[in-house]
Amino acid sequence: MSSLFEAYITNLGKYNEGRLVGETLKFPATTEEAQTLLKRIDVDGVRYEEIFITSFDGDVLGLYDHLGEYESIDELNHLAHVLSDLDQSDIEKFEAVIDSGEYTGSVHDLINLAQNLDCYDFYPGIDSEEALGRVYIEEMEMLDVPDDVLPYFDFEAYGRDARINDGGHFAPGGYVFNNGGKLVERYHGMEDIPPEHRIFAYPKLNIREQMAAYQEVIDRSALNEEKQRLPASREER
């Protein structure tokens, strides 16, 4: 399955210590891929436990503008799988709707949007009110205009009125509007994510790796205590 978008996963603990340590995870991903990445950035549940996302990138236009730094890896992976089930025309419709700003408040919203694209009509390549007017009049024949009147007809004005009535939006890929269909909330939260889409898991450490990890935590804790003790000693002097 090809990648739709990617996220730069960063070790939060090391970031707070002044070190930027992270790697890119491509979605959809597998548990093994997630565990391998987490192990490489020392997020193993012992040394460090928390992550955040520094940046997003991908082929779905505008998607990363609506994703945050503390998104759930499992939820992102589920979104990627839902998008993978769409054909290219529906991906373009999805891009147009999110460009309009509808249902973009969270990954939860984006998942539901991707599962309700039949609530929207999308006309690819229509980027102006005049072009919209021509589609409605010349192709869809929504208004009976005599042939001898067509050369003088104000397609732009008609398209403007149509857009206002539709509540439509010109996106980079075309014209989109809600056709009156009611969005059905099919995704309610993390409990709706299928087991095969849940990938976040700390890497499995063997005994030697566990011992080394615990020792590193002990050493780091001792070092932090020493750093805190030094300023106090100076103040006493």
Language-model region placement:
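N-terminal ordered "arm"
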Residues: M1-R47
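Short, glycine-biased loop/turn motifs at secondary-structure junctions and
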Residues: T10, N16-G22, M140, A157, ...
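Short, surface-exposed beta-strand/loop "edge" segments at domain boundaries and coil↔beta transitions
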Residues: K14-R19, D59-L63, K182-R186
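Structured domain cores in non-transmembrane regions
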Residues: E32-V107
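Extracytoplasmic/secretory-pathway segments with low complexity and glycosylation-like composition
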Residues: K93-E95, D99-E102, S106-E138, D148
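Long, highly charged low-complexity segments enriched in Glu/Asp and Lys/Arg with interspersed Ser/Thr
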Residues: R160-I207
